[in-house]
Amino acid sequence: MVLGGLVVSSSLAAPLAAQPAAISPARRAVYDSYLNFDPLVQGGRVVPGWIPGGASFWYAEGGPNDRLLHRVELATGRKTPLLDVERLRRSLTEQMGHEPAGRGVPFAQVAFTAPQQLRFELEGDTWQLDLATYALSRLPRPTANEGDRLATSELTRQRPQPFWQESFTGGGETRNLERRSPDGRWYLGVQGHDIALRSATDGRTLMRTTDGTADSLWTVETRRWEPWSPSGTRFVAERHDVRGMQRMLGAQWLKMFVEPLETRWTRAGGVLQASSLHVLDVVWGRPVALNLGDTRDSYLQVMGWLPDESRVLVAKYDRLLHSVEVWAADPSTGEGRVIMSERSPTFLTNHHEVVWGDDFPWTMLPDGTGFLWRSERDGWDHLYRYDLNGRMVARLTQGSFPVTSVVRVDQQRGWVYFMAQGDPARPYDRHLYRVPLAGGGTAQRLSEGAGVHEVTMCPLADCFVDSWSSPAGPPHTVLRRSDGAQVTALGEASIDRLRRVGWTPPREYVVKAADGSTDLWVTMYLPFDFDSTRSYPVVEFLYAGPQVAVRPTTFAEPGPAQYNRALANLGFVVVTLDARGTPGRSKAFHDVVFRKWGTFEIADHAGAIRQLGARLPFMDLTRVGIWGRSWGGHYALRALAQAPDVYSAASVEVPGFDPVGNQLYETYLGLPQQNAALYDQANAILLAPKVRGHLRLMSALSDVATFPETMRMSEELVRLGFQHELSIFANSGHGQVGQTARYNDEQRTQFFVRHLRP
């Protein structure tokens, strides 16, 4: 067993008589290089910074040793240096008393304070540069005798600071950043159980509430939506009554004397926190509670303030996410009314998006006359325009494709710019489109090139910067006008370093789901020295839950894809697919999971492996492993139980096994009090007697959601006499970072090397 990085013997660990096959140093070196993939791909993606006046932008190119900053004119695409590197470095050397590091621009971020003046940070100081004369001044640091409030640097005072607050949907406290008011005077956050404002001028703190307690506490959302009114004089905060919620017990195991921890948690069918929204003035008055009806067993999301601050719009989802109401509330009196509602016979959205995500289905119109609403009511995610009385003004998009987000509403010119997966030949590619705001028009595709596009609209919405890539296609970036016409190419990634290390382009395949008709897309990573005449073991990575799609669709896909790219270079074929029941396709594709959890997913995945193996003789289907995290861990365990003829080894990490343990399942199964049979069907612990092959379980003591279920599964396997490996990390939660993550990756790698023998 692994406890906090210490390897100790355990009666649960499988015998390790079969030692890992030798991995050559050269192959291991390629694997290690791929674990830090980004430096192998140079350039290609441009992140614009807008220059005052709106006629140009700047961007950084190159690494720390040879960085350059470019200016691009929007009208012509003309690119010129933003900075004269020699003059800049000469001025810095004179002011600092030594030459700055590297050969290029020694900083990557600038902030314009005037059209010809910018600020930057270097070696702990804030500098101001005059672009006309290259006069350089170091901004003074406050001295200690200016008082504690001013002893912090101006840069610190002018930046949002982190704060911690309770998250009842995620378990325990979460780290957040303060939100700056639109007038720039205040930063909004939380101290203890109360709302705090920090002055951007002198750093003083003003407590706007003082009655918060552990059972009745205040929080503020600073990441997912805008709490501030347009004038910066008022803001929306939440209050939560958490009495009745279950208390999950844990501990700080690495202290000299173990310290107990307690976390509020909601199991399926259990008590949710009772939340309410309140409007607070910056400096005076009592909080005004918004009257949104009965908010128990609900999720509340602030859609936004109207420009004249006469109303706050709020989306109120029911507990099962089967219905939503849009409320308009008066921030001065709190009085509210329902202006629009929608219901679904299955679910309106997935639980992750409502609880944690920021991909909301609404977009407020800039002039305050209404909002855009995304809905799957016709079977695909499409855009509808509503006024403030809840009347549908126009349907904006239609067709057999999903809209994924709204990029910009240009009311002056009458356009809505949005991202959608509208290419039927490549249904996961994402492109930019536009459609008339008035409705009645056909969507125009504005981006070109296969892959996933990320766009940044210019401030005046007359152009956009478009970066895209695909699994085998390195990043490109171009500047386009708002009608899609290309102005200039800005960058194409160089993969020379990657080729020198060794690279085989990833492949994409299409297979059929277990229903025999639905297309499933696969991304496959191959060894750098791939030889189609050889036979390779296979490792599948999966998530399979209804919350997210995980198949890599970009070139330098982050997260688990980075590990999977590296793993392939040890001599594996690594595949990932999103089966039925996952988001990103049609509503029918997603709805397969509704009330059918555990009945189809592994059939889709195992069927895909069989089809690929029949088509590709280099895949050795006698050596197939699988791994996943969270619900991916749940389904990796199911793979050993439901398809042991395909999968022979599984690394099951921070898994949720018993659906009663987490309210996330309610959206798809209903409440357990009325749907006990569905919860039994979804309970992977009941599959323990059917598990075959080699199993590695991994969990973490601070993961209040899944650690108990991992231990229950392990104990059940012990009772059955099934040998398995168990890794437990002491100072880690549901996600592993830093050395813990690296250690876990290495354990997983050795597990697959040992049992699949590449």
Model-flagged regions — what are they?
Residues 301-304, 309, 315-317, 452-758:
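Serine-hydrolase catalytic core recognition
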Residues 1-2, 28, 679:
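Hydrophobic/aromatic residues in well-formed alpha-helices
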Residues 10-11, 61, 351, 499, ...:
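Prokaryotic Sec-type signal peptides and long signal-anchor helices
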